[in-house]
Amino acid sequence: MARWQDVFESEPNFAAAVQKVFEAHKHKTIATLRADGSPRISALEVEFRGGEVVFGMMPRSFKAKDLRRDPRTELHSASVDSSEDDPMTWPGDARMSGRAVEITDPVERLRFIDDPSATYPFFVLDIHRVVRVHLDGDPPHLMVRIWEPGRPLRDAIAD
């Protein structure tokens, strides 16, 4: 299981840039899989706590049901537009994919949740991939930077 701390320890500048993009806005997007295998996109809040990427949700939410059935998921930061005059003002976006691991043990939950009586579904992300997309160069081009456990950070230029 790769934790956020693993990303931060191996590539601190990359991790800081990704975290900055995620923390710039309260609401993010999560992709889950419905029972029939079709994708579902939902809104949620994500936090970085205790070296983990963590998120909770309403007890009977569809996304919680999806993740309990199939934990594969992807989280996406908010995406905002650049200035019309200067595309380089675009802050970029980021995403993380992996498996959502539900934390049900009351003692373990206290590492992340302040209210011991909270019963809502709560997950940490077992990270398989982190991607940061931003503009770079002159003329600007889309730069895709990818982190995966045990592999060197790599860049791909999108044409």
Label for each model-derived stretch:
Residues E23-H25, S38-P39, R60, P87, ...:
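Short solvent-exposed loop/turn micro-motifs enriched in small/polar/acidic residues
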Residues V21-F22, L67, F112:
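A generic structural signal for nonpolar/aromatic side chains embedded in well-ordered alpha-helices
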Residues H25-P59, K65-L67, E74-S79:
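Short beta-strand segments
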Residues P12-N13, R69-P71:
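Proline-centered flexible-loop/turn and helix-kink motifs
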Residues Q5-R34:
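Short, conserved active-site entrance elements at the starts or edges of catalytic domains
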Residues M1-N13, V80, E84-D159:
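Charged, gly/pro-rich active-site loop segments
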Residues V21, E74, R132:
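Short alpha-helical functional segments enriched in proximate histidine and acidic residues
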Residues A15, R60-S61:
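Structural motif corresponding to alpha-helix initiation and N-cap regions
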